[in-house]
Amino acid sequence: MTEGVLPGLYLGNFIDAKDLDQLGRNKITHIISIHESPQPLLQDITYLRIPVADTPEVPIKKHFKECINFIHCCRLNGGNCLVHCFAGISRSTTIVTAYVMTVTGLGWRDVLEAIKATRPIANPNPGFRQQLEEFGWASSQKGARHRTSKTSGAQCPPMTSATCLLAARVALLSAALVREATGRTAQRCRLSPRAAAERLLGPPPHVAAGWSPDPKYQICLCFGEEDPGPTQHPKEQLIMADVQVQLRPGSSSCTLSASTERPDGSSTPGNPDGITHLQCSCLHPKRAASSSCTR
């Protein structure tokens, strides 16, 4: 069974990748196939094929950047990406964990705990866990150097945990609500998805009177991507857009105002004011937050 990890990002196995009913229901547009002999199976799907065996010594980390960019590009363009290996346990979970680490700033253990809340069988092998540890450490060091190099030049607001967790909280808790509302809470999971997400992300803010979450939600996580620049000098960093959340009184809808301004101060092509307004539903009202963070 395909499991939604974040809006636009799904985790499953080889059978899920061939299940036309599931693919259609989840509106899958992109698939990452990561196993020994990945092959494109459907004409209307964009594939990324990564031939990797599920053994601890395999350097799966070298595929992180390609996979992260593939997923990110898919989601930024409104698509839905399924990441699958043979059983949906180790290889695909490793890739999804690396992606969520990149766009939220969370450590791999926290991300894996959140994934297990919706897919209890998720379990990267020991070698892949070690590579996730190394990836997280290297990313944090790059982020620290990047922020230090910016202090004497352009503005670079410090990264705050509240900002980094904002999108993750909305996505994880909303996904958990949908799973509970549809009665699909995973068996053998000690905590419900919602309880596990709340334990990971902390208690939600006070819920205003009249707040009525709608399980049939549609959420877009708002991320900005740095200009890749000249081909000979590609930039590797992904940055989270400034996000402001405003609750609409008496409804479950809120407006996300996401600034897609680049680090150099320019705006995204085709969006001169640098602001994108998206409609979504979420579990809890959020206070407006505006900050930037780099990974």
From Swiss-Prot:
It is found in: Cytoplasm. Keywords: Cell membrane, Cytoplasm, Hydrolase, Lipoprotein, Membrane, Myristate, Protein phosphatase. One of its GO terms (cellular component) is plasma membrane. Residues 1-141 form the Tyrosine-protein phosphatase domain. The keyword Isomerase does not apply. The keyword Mitochondrion does not apply. Residues 251-272 are annotated as: Disordered. Highly expressed in testis. Expressed in brain; up-regulated in patients with multiple sclerosis gray matter lesions. Its main location: cytoplasm. Belongs to the protein-tyrosine phosphatase family. Non-receptor class dual specificity subfamily. PANTHER family: DUAL SPECIFICITY PROTEIN PHOSPHATASE 15 (PTHR45948:SF4), DUAL SPECIFICITY PROTEIN PHOSPHATASE DDB_G0269404-RELATED (PTHR45948). This is Dual specificity protein phosphatase 15. It comes from Homo sapiens. The gene is DUSP15.
